[in-house]
């Protein structure tokens, strides 16, 4: 089980996270309360022993290009309606690994219809990883019936409202390739060592 812990803001948080997780993420050029300056993102990327995703709601090629150049990012996580051509050009120009986020409703009136709509949207993108999320930093679970249907067709990373208490059940229901967490392993807005360790342990020990 691939485990990513997102939204770190300092080298101290990096030290906590990289002991346990497979990847982490830094939020830039976004309205998120976890956003950090590009210079700090670069420092974290340069000091990390695990992949660091540059996470943003940026849309245009020039915005992403500038951020990639200034941080040295090799991994990006796109939380916007960036065009498929933009993703293709970023991959071609910078050789970046792209995780593209897609929003899943919190409550679906028709899970099969929503899953098919998502699969159609996902198919337009040449993404290396697909993230199914409730919405940028919402801290809420999405409708797992939808993500489980999508996960039957393609490998997905699940995010939104995860914590050590629910991650095992979510994995059993959805059967994803991986999970991504941020606020669910924090205390007072800071990544907590015990919560991080417990989340990763539970996620990686699930049998399904």
Swiss-Prot record:
Its EC number is 5.3.1.24. Keywords: Amino-acid biosynthesis, Aromatic amino acid biosynthesis, Isomerase, Tryptophan biosynthesis. It comes from Pyrococcus furiosus (strain ATCC 43587 / DSM 3638 / JCM 8422 / Vc1). It comes from the Archaea. Pathway: Amino-acid biosynthesis; L-tryptophan biosynthesis; L-tryptophan from chorismate: step 3/5. InterPro entries: Aldolase_TIM, PRAI_dom, RibuloseP-bd_barrel, TrpF_fam. Pfam families: PRAI. It is an enzyme of class 5 (isomerase). GO terms for molecular function: phosphoribosylanthranilate isomerase activity. It catalyses: N-(5-phospho-beta-D-ribosyl)anthranilate = 1-(2-carboxyphenylamino)-1-deoxy-D-ribulose 5-phosphate. The lineage of its organism: Archaea, Methanobacteriati, Methanobacteriota, Thermococci, Thermococcales. GO terms for biological process: L-tryptophan biosynthetic process. This is N-(5'-phosphoribosyl)anthranilate isomerase. Belongs to the TrpF family. The keyword Transmembrane helix does not apply.
């Amino acid at each position: 089980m691939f485990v990513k812990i997102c939204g770190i803001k300092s080298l101290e948080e990096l030290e906590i996270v990289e002991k346990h997780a497979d990847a982490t993420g830094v939020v830039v050029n976004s309205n998120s309360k976890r956003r950090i300056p590009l210079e700090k993102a670069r420092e974290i990327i340069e000091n990390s022993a695990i992949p660091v995703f540059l996470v943003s709601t940026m849309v245009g090629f020039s915005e992403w290009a500038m951020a990639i150049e200034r941080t040295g990012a090799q991994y990006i996580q796109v939380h916007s309606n960036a065009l498929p051509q933009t993703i293709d050009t970023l991959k071609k120009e910078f050789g970046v690994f792209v995780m593209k986020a897609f929003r899943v409703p919190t409550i679906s009136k028709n899970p099969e219809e929503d899953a098919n709509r998502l699969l159609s949207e996902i198919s337009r993108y040449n993404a290396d990883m697909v993230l199914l999320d409730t919405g940028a930093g919402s801290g809420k679970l999405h409708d797992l019936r939808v993500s489980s249907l999508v996960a039957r067709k393609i490998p997905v990373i699940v995010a939104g409202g995860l914590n050590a208490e629910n991650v095992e059940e979510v994995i059993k229901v959805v059967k994803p390739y991986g999970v991504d967490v941020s606020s669910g392993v924090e205390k007072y807005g800071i990544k907590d060592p015990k919560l991080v360790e417990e989340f990763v342990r539970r996620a990686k020990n699930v049998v399904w």
